[in-house]
Amino acid sequence: MSLQPHGGFLVQAFHPDKEITSIHKEIELDAISLSDLELIAIGGYSPIQGFLTQADYESVVEKSRLVSGIVWSIPITLPVTEEKAATLQPGEEVKLVYQGETFGVIQVADIFEPNKRKEALLVYGTEDLAHPGVHKLHERPAIYVGGKITLIKRLAQKFPTYSFDPVETRQLFASKGWQTIVGFQTRNPVHRAHEYIQKAALETIDGLFLNPLVGETKSDDVSAAIRMESYEILLKNYYPENRVQLGVFPAAMRYAGPREAIFHALVRKNYGCTHFIVGRDHAGVGDYYGTYDAQKIFEQFKEDELGIIPLKFEHSFYCQQCEGMATTKTCPHDSSAHIILSGTKVREMLRNGEVPPSTFSRKEVVDVLIKGMQKEVVK
């Protein structure tokens, strides 16, 4: 499998010396647009070079492809109010501002009103406003601005030790001598089921890139700071140091299930991964998606047009009779012997003051989660 970035090149659009004194118009970004701006500029979203124009947006929504035919499954858009849109013209440069600071510039290509109902149905598979992705879609302004961007100021890194651009992770993997790298996306603390599939992958892959998402998530997700501490202690105690690399993914969570699984895989390809783990209900929320829908969607695309190999794992569990982690492929016992693990269940137990057993998560990880969540409650 090629280590080429998606589309064949790594976008590099960080130019801190760009002259902006003559640019007077500005667009206020929200947290999602801000993280998207940086990820476009550092090549995380290659080959996208800006917020999607109408033609690319409609193609992505309808076909999971850019107009060029390159696979891309999540629309990366810049929403503005109708009032702001009325002041903008195609062809002009506009500053991209967040909380009073200019972070970038967009070369406006077009300004258009999206069909958000269609976007919700095709990208999220539902119009239900209780779905956090659909809710956020409709909460954001009504008009989209498309065009190439330039990043002129980097965001402050919440986790500088673990913050890497795709250029840096590629160099890092090469320096470790890794020929094959498997990416793992998570927004939850790593429980025993995660550990099991990660280590199963490591039996045949050179290195694991544990790449937790630390951008905007649902309010009931465990905070990034607590999760990062739990990842550190898990890797220190239970993983071979020379076979794993921890690095943060500063994107917002979309909760788009199958569509987001493709997106997550393509982004990890840009970071230098050759393989990507897709478990049960990847990027799902509630009961909106089938257990393995996020795996099945990969069958809609040819392996060479994705350029990254999905590793599809069945739902793993702790079997009391096997006395270890297993799946239905490796365990013959009845489901009554199985303890089903999930990030949702771990979160529920912690919030109810219950201590998850060692069959759920390592004791060291549980201790970190309990202490961290108690501190957050005190705040």
Swiss-Prot record:
<keyword id="KW-0548">Nucleotidyltransferase</keyword>
<dbReference type="InterPro" id="IPR002650">
    <property type="entry name" value="Sulphate_adenylyltransferase"/>
</dbReference>
<dbReference type="InterPro" id="IPR024951">
    <property type="entry name" value="Sulfurylase_cat_dom"/>
</dbReference>
<dbReference type="InterPro" id="IPR015947">
    <property type="entry name" value="PUA-like_sf"/>
</dbReference>
<dbReference type="Pfam" id="PF01747">
    <property type="entry name" value="ATP-sulfurylase"/>
</dbReference>
<keyword id="KW-0067">ATP-binding</keyword>
<dbReference type="GO" id="GO:0070814">
    <property type="term" value="P:hydrogen sulfide biosynthetic process"/>
</dbReference>
<dbReference type="Pfam" id="PF14306">
    <property type="entry name" value="PUA_2"/>
</dbReference>
<keyword id="KW-0547">Nucleotide-binding</keyword>
<dbReference type="InterPro" id="IPR020792">
    <property type="entry name" value="SO4_adenylyltransferase_pro"/>
</dbReference>
<dbReference type="GO" id="GO:0005524">
    <property type="term" value="F:ATP binding"/>
</dbReference>
<dbReference type="InterPro" id="IPR025980">
    <property type="entry name" value="ATP-Sase_PUA-like_dom"/>
</dbReference>
<dbReference type="GO" id="GO:0004781">
    <property type="term" value="F:sulfate adenylyltransferase (ATP) activity"/>
</dbReference>
<comment type="similarity">
    <text>Belongs to the sulfate adenylyltransferase family.</text>
</comment>
<keyword id="KW-0808">Transferase</keyword>
<comment type="pathway">
    <text>Sulfur metabolism; hydrogen sulfide biosynthesis; sulfite from sulfate: step 1/3.</text>
</comment>
<protein>
    <recommendedName>
        <fullName>Sulfate adenylyltransferase</fullName>
        <ecNumber>2.7.7.4</ecNumber>
    </recommendedName>
</protein>
<dbReference type="GO" id="GO:0000103">
    <property type="term" value="P:sulfate assimilation"/>
</dbReference>
<dbReference type="InterPro" id="IPR014729">
    <property type="entry name" value="Rossmann-like_a/b/a_fold"/>
</dbReference>
